[in-house]
């Protein structure tokens, strides 16, 4: 359900933003994109969703706390917008999970592995510790 506005010439800002992020996700799904680009698109999608919730959804929730019948500047109902956003985000998250699994499988097939620290050998642990101490920590404030 797309929230109704007083003037239907306008598109709901939040749903439009989610449509843009859907296009980012579609780039991650495209098998003709290089694998490293597909990983980047997954990261961009994830970062965008984090910001969307921190800013857009939080603002809608605050508006709803102030006035349960509040509307946006263009007349979209805040409650209806939140309902529509929740439904769309659920769809996008399912699609993201499938894309993530597909990209990670493609990485394994390309012999690219991302290890967490519990999978490191002793030599890898020593290398990572030494690298951090001498190359990274010196640049941290």
Located regions from the model:
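N-terminal localization/anchoring segments of enzymes in phospholipid and broader phosphate metabolism
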Residues: 1-141
């Amino acid at each position: 359900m797309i929230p109704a506005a007083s003037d239907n010439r306008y598109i709901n800002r939040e749903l439009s933003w989610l449509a843009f992020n859907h296009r980012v996700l579609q780039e991650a799904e495209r098998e003709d994109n290089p694998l490293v680009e597909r990983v980047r698109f997954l990261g961009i999608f994830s970062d965008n969703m984090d910001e969307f919730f921190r800013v857009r959804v939080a603002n809608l929730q605050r508006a709803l706390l102030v006035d349960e019948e509040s509307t946006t500047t263009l007349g979209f109902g805040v409650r209806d917008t939140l309902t529509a956003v929740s439904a769309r985000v659920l769809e996008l998250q399912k699609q993201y999970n499938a894309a993530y699994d597909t990209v990670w499988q493609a990485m394994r097939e390309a012999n690219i592995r991302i290890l967490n620290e519990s999978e490191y050998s002793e030599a890898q642990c020593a290398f990572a510790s030494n690298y951090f101490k001498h190359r990274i920590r010196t640049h941290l404030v």
